From Swiss-Prot:
Function: GTPase that plays an essential role in the late steps of ribosome biogenesis.
Assembly mode: Associates with the 50S ribosomal subunit.
Protein name: GTPase Der
GO biological process: ribosome biogenesis; tRNA methylation; tRNA wobble uridine modification
List of residues binding GTP 2: 183-190, 230-234, 295-298
UniProt binding sites for GTP 1: 10-17, 57-61, 120-123
PROSITE patterns from the UniProt entry: G_ENGA
Every KH-like domain range: 353-437
Gene3D superfamilies found in the cross-reference section: 3.30.300.20, P-loop containing nucleotide triphosphate hydrolases
GO molecular function: ATP hydrolysis activity; GTP binding
UniProt entry tagged with the keyword Transmembrane: no
Length: 439
């Protein structure tokens, strides 16, 4: 089940990125600088009043003419409208109501999506009167903030999460397995999906996806019901290349959010890129099941060692997710295509796997006997018992004498024991250590 998406929308220079970065610095946990982290921080995980959601900074493009302002603003707003559950409509309280604000407001009213109107740059109490003219937008009561001074952000977020409570669909689980096909343009995502649809011959329907330029295809098989999310699109180059790349990334991230399993497709003739590492790293960071597919394998000159060598190089570049499954195919010739959905289903089953508490503790007891916990300072870690508290991904809590005694190497050892005994290939696992006083 995907978390709600909150998009910050508005014309250029109203302070969208400043607001996003302020929230990121205050409330959003950004993982350390690894290939799994997007440095531009277009997307970030957020939590307020125990509601978890994903925040998007739609950014603002500096235009060269008034016409470009309007067209780029419209594109930005439309993308955000399509993917968001709640929209923060940001306006500039110092500059006042602008014609472009009215055009954005008109789009938002037509969307019938929940909108929180936020008047930014209200740095002083006396400036609050500047907000009154924005009632003319017909979007509702404005919230006044100063993103630069972090004033009013709590009131704004209170309004945002109120809409989550009204969203009954947020609590519904879809029985279908959502699979996002991600990767660079022309790597063969659409070709593979078309091949899968042609071979399965059980397509329910093709419907426009929730993110622009993506298509959701429904496929039923003997072993599962799947939604295939094609993130292909925007393949042609443009004069505004940076803008298009930015929106392409936003759409891909939205598809990852919706997915249970993320399939990273790599061109066998090109190998893996930094862009590939970043995009699949995001899926890893938010704990999705992962399958890496090397496409166009028919174009590679090979011997009996080529595949192992290629996979070894991939594992070095994707060392932050050693659990990933790999598959070498040719969407063009159909080589191993029949294994794609089967392997994705295996990843999903492991992603959704539960282990009985008794069996779990037997394995951990054996692991402790084979390798005793290290002494940290003057204290040795004692593990009393372990239990699984969740799936997607499998999440375990270890009750111990002192969580400070757990060394990362021993935590990795315990997780590896879980992997070896319960086959968690294709999914990350999470472990947490909590103190329990010895009786």
């Amino acid at each position: 089940m995907a978390k709600p998406i909150v998009a910050i929308v508005g014309r250029p220079n109203v302070g969208k990125s400043t607001l996003f970065n302020k929230l990121a610095g205050k409330r959003i946990s950004i993982v350390q600088d690894t290939p799994g982290v997007t440095r531009d921080r277009i997307y970030a995980e957020a939590e307020w009043l125990n509601y978890k959601f994903t925040m998007i900074d739609t950014g603002g493009i500096e235009p060269k003419s008034e016409d470009i302002i309007v067209s780029q603003m419209r594109r930005q707003a439309q993308i955000a409208i399509e993917m968001a559950n709640v929209i923060i409509f940001l306006v500039d309280g110092k500059e006042g109501l602008a014609p472009a604000d009215k055009e954005v407001a008109q789009m938002l009213r037509k969307s019938k999506k929940p909108v929180v109107l936020v008047v930014n740059k209200i740095d002083k109490l006396k400036d609050e009167n500047n907000a009154y003219e924005f009632y003319n937008l017909g979007i509702g009561d404005p919230v006044t903030i100063s993103s630069s001074q972090a004033l009013g952000l709590g009131d704004m977020l209170d309004r945002v999460v109120e809409y989550f409570k009204d969203d009954e669909s947020a609590g519904e689980d879809d029985e279908r397995i959502n699979i996002a096909f991600i990767g660079k343009p022309n790597v063969g995502k659409s070709s593979l999906i078309n091949k899968l649809l042609g071979e399965e011959r059980l397509i329910v329907s093709d419907i426009p996806g929730t993110t622009r330029d993506s298509i959701d295809s429904y496929v039923d098989t003997d072993f599962g019901e799947f939604t295939l999310i094609d993130t292909a699109g925007l393949r042609r180059k443009s004069k505004v290349k940076e803008e298009i790349e930015r929106y392409s990334v936003i759409r891909t991230y939205a598809s990852i959010e919706r997915a249970d399993v993320c399939i990273l497709m790599i061109d066998a003739t090109e190998g893996i890129s930094e862009q590939d590492q970043k995009i699949i790293g995001y899926a890893h960071d938010i704990n999705k099941a992962i399958l890496v597919i090397v496409n166009k394998w028919d174009l590679v000159e090979k011997d009996d060692k080529t595949m192992d060598k290629f996979k070894k190089e991939l594992k070095v570049n994707l060392s932050f997710m050693p659990y990933a499954k790999y598959l070498f195919i040719s969407a063009k010739t159909g080589q191993r295509v029949v294994k794609v959905l089967q392997t994705a289903k295996e990843c999903y089953d492991n992603y959704n796997k539960r282990v009985k508490t008794g069996v779990l503790n037997d394995v951990i007891s054996q692991a402790i006997m084979m390798k005793e916990p290290p002494i940290v300072g003057t204290k040795r870690l004692k593990i009393y018992y372990v239990t699984q508290i969740g799936t997607k991904p499998p999440t375990f809590i270890f009750f111990v004498n002192d969580p400070a005694c757990i060394h990362f190497s021993y935590q990795r050892y315990l997780e590896n024991q879980l992997r070896e005994n319960f086959d968690f290939q294709g999914t990350g696992i999470k472990s947490e250590f909590r103190e329990r006083k010895e009786k």
